[in-house]
Amino acid sequence: MKIYLVGGAVRDTLLKQTVVDKDYVVVGSSVEEMLALGYQQVGKDFPVFLHPKTQQEYALARTERKTGYGYQGFSCDANKDVTLSEDLLRRDLTINAIAQDEHGTLTDPFHGIADINAKILRHVSDAFTEDPLRVLRVARFAARFHHLGFTIAPETLQLMTDIANSGELDHLTPERVWQECDKALSSQSPQVFFDVLKQCQALIVLFPEVDALFGVPQPEKWHPEIDTGIHTLMVLEQTSLLSDNKAVRFAALVHDLGKALTPKQDWPKHYGHGQKGLPVIKKLCARIRVPNEYRDLALLVSDQHQNIHNAFELRAETIVKLFDKGDFWRKPQRLTELLLCCHGDLRGRTGFEQSSYPQAEYLLHCYELASNVDVQSIIAAGYQGSQIKSQLQLNRAETINNYKIQYIESKQLH
């Protein structure tokens, strides 16, 4: 038997990126031999083992043959005669089909090193089209390595388009679609993930609510980029520069879904789009099993982003109600997350990429002042039951209003 380090660990070492997981392939062995050596078998569909000491994954070299639909419709052959090259042949991209032996010698039958140097994501073989999950994986790699200059080979993008048009994507489970999306949201350039899906015609299948935004115009005065789909990807890009919080990034992606519902005769204006988008977001999140934490922030951002943009025009009472509705007294981080999305929304427009967002500082100070209003003095003054909350809201609004007057006066002086 011979053991090789394969896949991401080899690729990331060559890219001088941090290696997170190490996966090994074992050539010329069997299930019986691995168990006899103390390895623990964990793979049900194909023989994968955990090392008795390191707990790292070791898989027997195998070939795969498509037997059904989706990414699970495969039969595997892991007999002793399967070669290293045969195992590498079943992998998705050439950059993931490089192996390294115990002496550091590389085996690269499909020229993955050349593609790493050329910064190209290229499929290993035409068997690429047998696994629809690869559309999402390649889009995710494009997002992950975009900052390094990687692009997808045109012929690979064509195969991804073929998969999207074949109906195979319909066989992906919602959980797996979300898993890949969630990983993409943690990448350095998550907007590239959705851009690639749009290019290969997979976005309309997997995320039709986002795809519907493309071709919907906005007022050029406020949106020089005009197209709502383009704006959405710009917002995701800018928000990702401001925060690595995946829930914040997801909320940025879906904040304008309501604009797709605007009747054409009302274009390019989109009255009430934030509220119109709420049922669309709920439906999307239910379909692909988005975590509640992500969903709740997304709903808040869609519902309130116009109010946040208009913060300086809001009455103090309205600001207190906004803080109540967002449950910010118990979850102050939610206000920060909402403001990050809104800042990204402002910057996600052609020519506004460096813009500051004074609304955030203003509302955070309003919140700080309102949080410090003393409820004990209200109780001591004799208020009881529901009167306490009503008076607390009045006192908070008064405190915010006093600050608002000072803020406006200070700006007028400058």
From Swiss-Prot:
GO molecular function: ATP binding; CCA tRNA nucleotidyltransferase activity; cyclic-nucleotide phosphodiesterase activity; magnesium ion binding; phosphatase activity; tRNA binding
Catalysed reactions, semicolon-separated: a tRNA precursor + 2 CTP + ATP = a tRNA with a 3' CCA end + 3 diphosphate; a tRNA with a 3' CCA end + 2 CTP + ATP = a tRNA with a 3' CCACCA end + 3 diphosphate
Presence of keyword ATP-binding: yes
Binding site for Mg(2+): D21, D23
Cofactor note: Magnesium is required for nucleotidyltransferase activity. Nickel for phosphatase activity.
Manganese recorded as keyword: no
GO aspect biological process, one term: tRNA 3'-terminal CCA addition
The protein's Enzyme Commission number: 2.7.7.72, 3.1.3.-, 3.1.4.-
Cofactors: Mg(2+); Ni(2+)
Secretion signal span: none
Pfam families documented for this protein: HD (PF01966), PolyA_pol (PF01743), PolyA_pol_RNAbd (PF12627)
SUPFAM superfamilies according to UniProt: Nucleotidyltransferase, Poly A polymerase C-terminal region-like
Source domain of life: Bacteria
Annotated ATP binding sites: G8, R11, R91, R137, R140
Family: Belongs to the tRNA nucleotidyltransferase/poly(A) polymerase family. Bacterial CCA-adding enzyme type 1 subfamily.
Subunit structure: Monomer. Can also form homodimers and oligomers.
Functional note: Catalyzes the addition and repair of the essential 3'-terminal CCA sequence in tRNAs without using a nucleic acid template. Adds these three nucleotides in the order of C, C, and A to the tRNA nucleotide-73, using CTP and ATP as substrates and producing inorganic pyrophosphate. tRNA 3'-terminal CCA addition is required both for tRNA processing and repair. Also involved in tRNA surveillance by mediating tandem CCA addition to generate a CCACCA at the 3' terminus of unstable tRNAs. While stable tRNAs receive only 3'-terminal CCA, unstable tRNAs are marked with CCACCA and rapidly degraded.
Leftover remarks: A single active site specifically recognizes both ATP and CTP and is responsible for their addition.
Protein known as: Multifunctional CCA protein
Species: Shewanella frigidimarina (strain NCIMB 400)
